């Protein structure tokens, strides 16, 4: 799976197992270059994360319902949604609430 944002192809990694959902981006040292997708998830935390991220929350139809740029470490975000995307910094600048997030397989 991938998406195109600002003419860049970005790989989407669906987190489907309990372990992958629990770990998410915690303890990652290398810069984040992919989008990590949590299904049936409307809250995240950034505890134990070593870098800031952008967050996008979608409804079941992939409509963007919430965007937050530059989420710092040790924060909790709780918003109503179906999918939560943890994204590289700067990704939110090209997106708008109300738009549909395009996912290609």
Question: Model segments located where?
Answer:
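Compact, glycine-rich, soluble single-domain proteins
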Residues: 1-105
């Amino acid at each position: 799976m991938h998406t195109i944002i600002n003419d860049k192809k970005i790989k989407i990694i669906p987190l489907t197992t309990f372990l992958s959902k629990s770990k998410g981006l915690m303890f990652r040292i290398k810069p984040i270059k992919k989008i990590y997708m949590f299904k049936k998830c409307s809250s995240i935390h950034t505890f134990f994360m070593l870098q800031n991220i952008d967050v996008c929350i979608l409804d079941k139809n992939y409509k963007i319902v919430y965007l937050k740029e530059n989420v710092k470490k040790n924060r909790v975000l709780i918003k109503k949604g179906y999918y939560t995307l943890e994204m590289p910094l700067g990704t939110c600048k090209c997106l708008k609430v109300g738009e549909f997030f395009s996912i290609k397989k």
